[in-house]
């Protein structure tokens, strides 16, 4: 058959991920944008933006990019290399059942996983309500007054509890007591945190070894890692008598049956909510919790959701007590924790909403009864089972049979916990079935059926819970799945996430989180692997981690990578600890000074303080660059004690500084190391490598540059890359290499989200990653060019260029029209946008980072909105609008405003449909502007009465 004359083959590649799916502007749109910016080509723009002195010499290359289908096939092949056995290892990680309605409507829903930390409360009301439910759940179960909105993991939470204890204790002691029944990873991390701060660790049996007068605090595990359930009330009273603080690490499921830490008198309770519907995922991510007595709420780290009111007096939620956080208090902050595990906290809260108190109690009772049955069978076989009273964990003395039994259990497709050389630990959970118990009995040499044993109760009578929990109606009113689904949908609709609009937050890199990248995280072969399984059962994970590490080394120019840090802040901390350990190993213990520019992110000085360093601040010039005269002077002044400097590159002002190599040379000349914060790596991938320009260590925000979603405030990953001389000092872990220095509970941090970044690298390829960086720079310069004349771009290079973000100055609006940066941010909500980063690193400004994923149409919509806001300010300047009663001061406008009595000197049309706003699919803020002062003065951090829900629904 002859081919028609007008028929031609095309090179259309529908699954070319980099150019057709991830990068927003088309080639034709890029040409249009380049004309606006004033360049003939993308490469010409890059040549003028990235200094030649730091340009990468060789291109990124590791094979052709994969299509989505090819990458998913590769992921499936890798996942299948993991062996999915039933793990009864426990140690803080347990099998759980994620209700499908929660998996589909929260975990797999971009309305939840692509949102940002809820700093803008008006567009975060759904997430904030879910987090308030979480805080209420934690307060109820722990019996304490105030809970935060999650921490990174249980071990990190324990370290934060120790830090609180040292801060608030009346005792002047410098030692902290750790219950030997705490999980090993918790003990390891507490040791890591204490050592740089000069705190002594005392480890032992609290009933035998605790000297209350000699410590500023203590932590107890409840139930213990080996199963013990003990009453700590007397010990807590002794600690209080000596001015010390008591913390309890408690299993929230056990608290459904056991007396709460608060009822024992504990000051702090911490733990993990992993078993509330969040898969183990080879170690994470999971939401840790912390609750404290009311007196200590201002010393608590992390985010804290509170109840306030909006401009109409209606109930509204917001983040409370933010002045205690690291971005304000810097080296004086309670912690370096920046964000935590919001998505997982939401899942855990919905698990409690789904099951209610009776369901949670029934699950706990079932787990306990199964454990009792298991113990009865083992006792019948003649084994010694400890302890006498327990919840879900038992320890069996097996002598020389340990290896044989563990091997037999694996043959039954069950993992048990090896304890020492003669004991075996077994922890049951929600997923444990009768066949599980029977398989364990067979491994121990028995052949029983579950029905042969009638379980008794093996919890201590004096510790049985009598107090109520989850009493708020929210934990009772959504049992039918229809109502549960609608409730989650209503909350999602109140929020603004990437599934609705671009989120141009500077220093946050809110890029595409592609569906193909997200799919594998729910595969059981990834999600159901316990972090402490034998290495040969996690070969898929090991391959993924090794290959991703190699790719990150190629991208950064570093020699080694640690995947352990489970946030950017933890990456900073781990990197600084590596520097500290390096100096100590070389006999330079006295090197403890860290130079940090005034423009640095607040986590930098907070992390340095935690690593035992003294922060010396370096000036920044009017051009936004490090003041080299001051830098040289400080480096010379502290030459004998200089440990390191911390810089961000490109700078936090959105510019590639020409002098970065000189900065590194000055530090090295005076015996220090260079920590380069990788927060802005999205402007460097494929164009410049930190390891090539003089940096010794960096952390990488995989939840920024490498596509892990922000989850509304977590999860994240902050692996660190180091040059070879620092590699021996990367974090260790007691469960793997036995080395010290653990910074996260699990050896590879939040491992189950690493497939996202790996998929991204596979589908983009080296060339695609480089192109993404170039387009990110183009998009930022395009926005700057379009806003020129209306707003000044505060910092630019000598050639007038910005990097991947730009800072626009809104301070003139305050002077000429009384319009604040807050007014601009709230007016953007009316336009359907999340505001750019406000007042950082310069007060009264907006930092805009569009990323490479946004199309020209979306960039234009945002620019149109910003230009319209400038015209509204001009109308105030000219007297055409009232200075107080105008669309900017009254923003955001709600449906209630639209349909209510209208007495404003501007139209409903102007109020609700400004340029940039969609008419059919408009986002409506559910509340008017939130009163921040009221919320802090009238702090309420648990669910309000049911009447307020009814009022909100009317």
UniProtKB/Swiss-Prot annotation:
Function summary: The glycine cleavage system catalyzes the degradation of glycine. The P protein binds the alpha-amino group of glycine through its pyridoxal phosphate cofactor; CO(2) is released and the remaining methylamine moiety is then transferred to the lipoamide cofactor of the H protein.
InterPro entries listed in its UniProt record: GcvP, GDC-P_C, GDC-P_N, GDC_P, PyrdxlP-dep_Trfase, PyrdxlP-dep_Trfase_major, PyrdxlP-dep_Trfase_small
HAMAP family for this protein: GcvP (MF_00711)
N6-(pyridoxal phosphate)lysine found at: 704
Assigned protein family: Belongs to the GcvP family.
Cofactor(s) this protein requires: pyridoxal 5'-phosphate
Protein name as it appears in the record: Glycine dehydrogenase (decarboxylating)
Gene Ontology cellular component terms for the protein in this record: cytosol; glycine cleavage complex
Root EC class: oxidoreductase
Molecular function GO labels: glycine binding; glycine dehydrogenase (decarboxylating) activity; pyridoxal phosphate binding
Subunit structure, as described in the record: The glycine cleavage system is composed of four proteins: P, T, L and H.
PANTHER family: GLYCINE DEHYDROGENASE (DECARBOXYLATING), MITOCHONDRIAL, GLYCINE DEHYDROGENASE, DECARBOXYLATING
Keyword terms, alphabetized: Oxidoreductase, Pyridoxal phosphate
Example GO biological process: glycine decarboxylation via glycine cleavage system
Reactions catalysed, as given in the entry: N(6)-[(R)-lipoyl]-L-lysyl-[glycine-cleavage complex H protein] + glycine + H(+) = N(6)-[(R)-S(8)-aminomethyldihydrolipoyl]-L-lysyl-[glycine-cleavage complex H protein] + CO2
Pfam families registered for this protein in UniProt: GcvP2_C, GDC-P
EC number: 1.4.4.2
């Amino acid at each position: 058959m002859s081919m028609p004359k007008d028929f031609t083959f095309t090179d259309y590649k529908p699954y070319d991920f980099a150019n057709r799916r991830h990068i927003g502007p088309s080639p034709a749109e890029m040409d249009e944008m380049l004309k606006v910016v004033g360049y003939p080509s993308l490469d010409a723009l890059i040549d003028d933006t990235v200094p030649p002195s730091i340009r990468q010499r060789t291109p990124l290359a590791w094979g052709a990019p994969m299509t989505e289908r090819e990458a998913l096939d590769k992921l499936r092949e890798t996942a299948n290399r993991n062996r999915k056995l039933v793990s009864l290892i426990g140690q803080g990680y347990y099998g759980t059942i994620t209700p499908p309605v929660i998996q589909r409507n929260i975990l797999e829903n971009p309305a939840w996983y692509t949102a940002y930390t809820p700093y803008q409360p008006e567009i975060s009301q759904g997430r904030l309500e879910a987090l308030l439910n979480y805080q209420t759940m934690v307060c109820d179960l722990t019996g304490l007054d105030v809970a935060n909105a999650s921490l990174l993991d249980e071990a990190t939470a324990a370290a934060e509890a120790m830090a609180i204890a040292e801060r608030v204790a009346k005792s002047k002691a410098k030692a902290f007591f750790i219950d030997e029944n705490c999980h090993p990873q918790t003990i390891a991390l507490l040791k890591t945190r204490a050592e740089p701060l000069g705190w002594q660790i005392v480890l032992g049996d609290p009933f035998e070894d605790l000297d209350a007068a000699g410590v500023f605090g203590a932590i107890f595990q409840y139930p213990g890692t080996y199963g013990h359930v003990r009453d700590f009330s007397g010990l807590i009273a002794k600690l209080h008598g000596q001015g010390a603080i008591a913390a309890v690490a408690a299993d929230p499921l056990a608290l459904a049956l056991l007396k709460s830490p608060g009822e024992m008198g504990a000051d702090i309770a911490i733990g993990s909510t992993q078993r509330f519907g969040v898969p183990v995922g080879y170690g994470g991510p999971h939401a840790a919790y912390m609750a404290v007595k009311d007196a200590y709420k201002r010393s608590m780290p992390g985010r804290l959701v509170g109840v306030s009111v909006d401009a109409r007096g209606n109930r509204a939620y917001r983040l409370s007590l933010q002045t205690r956080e690291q971005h304000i208090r810097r080296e004086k902050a309670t912690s370096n924790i920046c964000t935590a595990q919001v998505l997982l906290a939401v899942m855990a809260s919905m698990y409690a909403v789904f099951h209610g108190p009776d369901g949670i109690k029934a699950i706990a009772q079932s787990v306990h009864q199964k454990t009792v049955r298991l113990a009865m069978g083992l006792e019948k076989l003649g084994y010694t089972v400890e302890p006498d009273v327990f919840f879900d964990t038992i320890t069996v003395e097996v002598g020389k049979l340990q290896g044989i039994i563990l091997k037999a259990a694996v043959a039954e497709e069950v993992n048990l916990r090896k304890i020492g050389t003669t004991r075996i630990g077994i922890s049951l959970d929600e997923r444990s079935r009768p066949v599980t118990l029977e398989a364990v009995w067979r491994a121990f040499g028995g052949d029983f059926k579950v029905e042969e044993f009638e379980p008794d109760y093996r919890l201590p009578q004096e510790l049985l819970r009598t107090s109520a929990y989850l009493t708020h109606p929210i934990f009772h009113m959504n049992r039918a799945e229809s109502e549960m689904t609608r409730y989650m949908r209503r909350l999602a609709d109140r929020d603004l996430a990437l599934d609705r609009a671009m989120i141009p937050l500077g220093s946050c890199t809110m890029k595409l989180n592609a569906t193909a990248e997200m799919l594998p995280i729910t595969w059981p072969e990834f999600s159901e692997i316990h972090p402490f399984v034998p290495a040969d059962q996690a070969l898929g994970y090991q391959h993924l981690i090794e290959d991703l590490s190699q790719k990150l080394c190629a991208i950064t120019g570093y020699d080694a990578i640690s995947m352990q840090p489970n946030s950017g802040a933890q990456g900073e901390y781990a990197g600084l600890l590596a520097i500290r350990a390096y100096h100590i190993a070389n006999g330079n213990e006295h090197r403890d000074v860290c130079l940090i520019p005034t423009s640095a992110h607040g986590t930098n000085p907070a992390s340095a303080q935690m690593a035992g360093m003294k922060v010396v601040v370096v000036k920044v010039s009017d051009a936004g660059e490090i003041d080299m005269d001051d830098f040289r002077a400080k480096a010379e002044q502290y030459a004998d004690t200089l440990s390191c400097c911390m810089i961000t590159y490109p700078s936090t002002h959105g510019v590639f500084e020409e002098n970065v190599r000189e900065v590194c040379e000055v530090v090295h000349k005076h015996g220090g190391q260079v920590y380069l914060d990788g927060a802005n790596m999205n402007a460097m991938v494929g164009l410049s490598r930190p390891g090539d320009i003089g940096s010794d260590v960096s952390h990488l925000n995989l939840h920024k540059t490498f596509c892990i979603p922000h989850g509304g405030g977590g999860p994240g990953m902050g692996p660190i890359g180091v040059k070879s001389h620092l590699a021996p000092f990367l974090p260790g872990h007691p469960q793997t290499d036995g080395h010290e220095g653990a910074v996260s509970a699990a050896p590879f941090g939040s491992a189950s989200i690493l497939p996202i970044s790996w998929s991204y690298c596979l589908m983009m390829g080296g060339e695609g990653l480089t192109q993404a960086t170039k387009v990110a720079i183009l998009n930022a310069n395009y926005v700057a060019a379009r806003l020129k004349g209306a707003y000044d771009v505060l910092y630019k290079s000598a050639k007038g260029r910005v990097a991947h973000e730009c800072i626009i100055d809104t301070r003139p609006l305050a002077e000429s029209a009384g319009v604040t940066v807050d007014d601009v941010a709230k007016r953007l909500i009316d336009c359907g946008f999340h505001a750019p980063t406000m007042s950082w690193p310069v007060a009264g400004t907006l930092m805009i980072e569009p990323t490479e994923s946004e199309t020209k149409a979306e960039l234009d919509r945002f620019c149109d909105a910003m230009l319209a806001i400038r015209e509204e300010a001009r109308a105030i300047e000219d007297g055409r609008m009232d200075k107080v009663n105008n669309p900017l001061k009254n923003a955001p406008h709600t449906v209630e405003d639209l349909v209510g009595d209208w007495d404003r000197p501007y139209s409903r049309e102007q109020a609700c449909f400004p340029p940039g706003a969609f008419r059919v699919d408009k986002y409506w803020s559910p509340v008017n502007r939130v009163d921040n002062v009221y919320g802090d003065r009238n702090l309420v951090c648990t669910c309000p009465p049911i009447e307020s829900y009814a009022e909100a629904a009317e």
